Amino acid sequence: MALISLAIDYKKSPIEVRSEFALSGLDVSMLYRSILAIDNVVHAVILSTCNRTEVYLEISDLIVVDDILVWWQGYVRNPNYKIKDYFKLRQGTEVIMHLMKLACGLESMVLGEPQILGQVKDSYTLSKKNHAIGKELDRVFQKVFATAKRVRSETRIGYCPVSVAFSAITLAKRQLDNISSKNVLIIGAGQTGELLFRHVTALAPKQIMLANRTIEKAQKITSVFRNASAHYLSELPQLIKKADIIIAAVNVLEYIVTCKYVGDKPRVFIDISIPQALDPKLGELEQNVYYCVDDINAVIEDNKDKRKYESSKAQKIIVKSLEEYLEKEKAIISNSAIKELFQKADGLVDLSLEKSLAKIRNGKDAEEIIKRFAYEIKKKVLHYPVVGMKEASKQGRSDCLVCMKRMFGLNVEK
């Protein structure tokens, strides 16, 4: 079994590309059923956020990569975008190292941001619910979560956390001097939407409106805040008329706010959704300001230097954690092989022993039978090693011969 990952992220792909290859907003159960139906795919975890879409897989043959790319390409709406031009393949230890760095926030657009860990955990949970995760992937993710917890407790990588949500609010503040007199509309009540809401409430705007597909979730978030209200997405046309700032963090497959919704009133539009939820043409209207996820980079760069030192400390913890994981995996593999070896030996001994005991009970010469039993066991136990040594000798594999000699305590010098 081999461990691989295929990824499209913000480092190599601009927002329009990430939007095309995003798997968020699709039926999760359907995604898992379809990917597990591919020959040589054994287990899978699918991660899709605003900055990346990654698929982690246990496979039985590397040839399956082409089939996975075909599967992924099938969800792309615009055929001009070819996944082979953008994806990155990782294998083995590289996958685990990347996932550890990712969960610790070291691969994020905002260095050290904590939201990604929750997103990785959510992806892991969904994989388990869909019976898509196996023992090896499960051990990998458990070690990743333990590593992220250790990094958070032993470094200050998340000190004064700066997230994409926080950076979005920073952009809004730059455009509007006095947010306390403004109405803010947040679209989406997921993890990022809730974080946006909490950042906005700290600025005490005139009114905060939170729109979501299910109003119960929006009501739960807004219920403890004054001047906050929950709404259905179907109310967007009316809500936009009231809003000065519109921020979207929602999973949709097409634009839910377009130019037909807005008049001459100046507004700030910030879209951190992938795929995009707000039509970029909104920014072409003279009175509007429009930002997407990639525009947040400038804000984020201001905060990177503060976290670089803590990042180096986190890297050391991750390297140590990876070493621990690999050592444990070696032990698991060797213990499994040892257990199988003993089971094989037990099977050989039990069959011959029962035959020998039956002969003794029938009055046969015990000494002769024991000698015969010992001879038969010797032949059976040494049969496969002898065959293996002969085969290694034919192939000129002196390294295999040396290894087998060591296994049986023989002189390797001869």
Curated annotation (Swiss-Prot):
Describe the family membership recorded for this protein in Swiss-Prot or TrEMBL. Belongs to the glutamyl-tRNA reductase family.
Mind giving the lineage of the organism this protein is from? Bacteria, Pseudomonadati, Pseudomonadota, Gammaproteobacteria, Thiotrichales
Q: What else is known?
A: During catalysis, the active site Cys acts as a nucleophile attacking the alpha-carbonyl group of tRNA-bound glutamate with the formation of a thioester intermediate between enzyme and glutamate, and the concomitant release of tRNA(Glu). The thioester intermediate is finally reduced by direct hydride transfer from NADPH, to form the product GSA.
Q: How does it assemble?
A: Homodimer.
Set out the biological process GO terms recorded for this chain's protein: protoporphyrinogen IX biosynthetic process from glutamate
This protein's superkingdom? Bacteria
Query: Which residues carry the site feature described as Important for activity?
Result: H98
Q: Please write the reaction equations for the catalytic activity of this protein.
A: (S)-4-amino-5-oxopentanoate + tRNA(Glu) + NADP(+) = L-glutamyl-tRNA(Glu) + NADPH + H(+)
Q: What is this protein called?
A: Glutamyl-tRNA reductase
The pathway to which it is assigned is: Porphyrin-containing compound metabolism; protoporphyrin-IX biosynthesis; 5-aminolevulinate from L-glutamyl-tRNA(Glu): step 1/2
Give a yes or no for keyword NADP in this entry: yes
Q: Where does NADP(+) bind?
A: G188, A189, G190, Q191, T192, G193
Disulphide bond pairs = none
